[in-house]
Each structure stands twice: as structure tokens, then as C-alpha cells.
Amino acid sequence: MQIYSSEIVRIGDQAKLFLDEGIIVFFGDNAPEELQDFAVIHKLEQIFGEIVIGTKINLSDANLEVVSVGPVANENFKNLGHLVLKVDSSTEEAQLGDVKCTFDKKPNIEIG
């Protein structure tokens, strides 16, 4: 079941450096200018449900699966289009607004 879809409209200059560390920071297309340099800016269409453990995320050429969801992650996503995906292999729980994922390969972030 699809719970949301979005289109990447801008990739901040520092966003790929974060990806190298296993972190993808999303903000909606209304994000303040000072946050856009390190973020992936996306146009969120509609949200049909919440991100939960087991949710599958298709991101460009990669398939991710949610293993932990921080307690305010869904609220931030719904209200701000803000989502922090951590796609590293650590086993620690997700922090407040984070969503931890396993992946088949690291995503290649592209506009579109």
C-alpha cells in the first residue's frame, strides 16, 4: 500500500555529503532558505498513512525498509515535509524525528 509520494525538486549542495554518512534530510518545498543547502527538497503530494516499521521506501534506484521510527517523525513529515532517513547499518533506535532504514544499496539522489 502506498502511503505517500513525492518528487525531488532540488538537492542542496551539502546533501550528498550527508548521504555519504548515511543520512538523507528531506524538507518540503517551503523550507527556509538556510535549511535548503543540506537538504533534499521535495514536493510532497498526499500522505495516505504513517511511516511504520516495515514500510518500504522506493528512493530513486534503491529499496529501503523502515526498521525504527522516532516518536515525532510522522508529525514532522505531515506538517513540514521534513524527514530524516538514516540508511546506515547501525542497530541503534531512531532518534526523535529520524526514520532508520535498511537498504539493498545506498540511494542515488536525483531530481525528479
PLM region spans:
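N-terminal, charge-rich interaction modules
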Residues: 1-25
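A structural micro-motif recognizing beta-strand termini
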Residues: 28-29, 41-46, 103-105
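Short, charged beta-turn/beta-strand-edge "cap" motif at the junction between a beta-strand
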Residues: 31, 45-46, 62-65
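Short, well-ordered loop/turn sites that connect or cap secondary structure elements
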Residues: 49-51, 57-58, 109-111
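Short, conserved beta-turn/loop elements at beta-strand boundaries and strand-helix junctions
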Residues: 62-63, 70-75
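Short, solvent-exposed secondary-structure boundary/capping segments
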Residues: 73-84
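Helix-rich interaction surfaces within compact, conserved domain-sized segments
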Residues: 89-112
